[in-house]
Amino acid sequence: MANLKPGTGKTTSAVWLAHIFVQAGNSVLLVDADPSGSALEWADLAAMDPRLAPPQAAFPFRVVALPSRDLHRRLPAIAQADDVVIIDTPQLEDHAAIALSALRYADEIVIPCAPSPIEINRTTPVREEITEVAAARDQPARSAVLLNRCVARAHSTADAREALASLDYDVLGTAVPRLEVYAQSFGRPVPGTGRQVWRRVAHDLIERCPPPCPVRSGPPGHHLPAQAAQDHPRPRVPGITGSSPGGRTRP
C-alpha cells in the first residue's frame, strides 16, 4: 500500500485485506513499515478486546514492525514461510527512503485513492517514484489504484475511474464504499460485516498475478488452485501486498 500523503486508507486496506487472505487459508505476514506504527497499534488494541479468547484471535497472522530503509534486503528472510506479505508503507512525502525500499520489494503496488480530484492528482508523484524504482529491480512491479471511500450512487466514483484510466492507470474493478464499519474499525477486531467487499478486492489482485498463482482469494472451497505451489515459486502480491525470493505474494 503506497501513497504520497497520510490518511488515504493504506492501513485500513492493509489490515482488512490481511484478514481476507488468512481467512482464505493463506499464511499472511503484515509488515508495518510506517514509523507511526498504526497497524501494530491496531493489532495490540484489538488483542485487548475482552470478548476474544485467546487474544491472538484478533489478528490471526503475524504483524511485524519494519520501518527500515533496507526493508527490501531484510524482509526476504523474515517472510520466507509466508504466502502473502502485505506492507503498510509510510507516506512518501515524509518517509521516502522507507517507502521506496518497500516499493523495491513488492510485486504489486496498490495505491488507495478517494474519488476526488485532489487525491487523483496526488497519484502522479507515486507513479513517478514507481517508475524510478523500476530501474533497481529485475522486473517492474505491477501497480493499480484502489478506489476507496466511495459514496454510494455518486457520480464521483465513475468520474474518478474515467479520469484515472485517461492517465493510463490500472484501476481495480472493486471500489470500496465509504462505510462506518471501515472508518471505525481501527483498534478493534475486524468484524464479519463488510468483508465481502475486501474479498472482491483480493480477487481483483489475484486476477492480476501471472500464472501460476497459488494464493487463495476466497473462503475454503472458493479459491484459486494451489497445486502449482508444490512445483513453482509463488508470485508476490503487495502494497497489499511483497514476498521473499522464494516467491510469496506481496501487495
Q: In which residue ranges do the predicted regions lie?
A:
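C-terminal boundary of histidine-terminating zinc-finger modules
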Residues: Q184-H203
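Inter-motif core of Ras-like GTPase G domains
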Residues: A96-P117
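Beta-strand-loop-alpha "switch" segments that mediate conformational coupling across diverse proteins
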Residues: R149-V190
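Conserved C-terminal guanine-recognition region of P-loop GTPase G domains, centered on the G4
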Residues: T123-D138, N148
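P-loop/Walker-type NTP enzyme "switch/lid" segment
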Residues: A2-T8, V15-A96, L100, F186-P191
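Hydrophobic anchor at the start of a short beta-strand
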Residues: S27-V28, V85, I109, A141-S143, ...
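Long, low-complexity, intrinsically disordered segments
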Residues: A226-P251
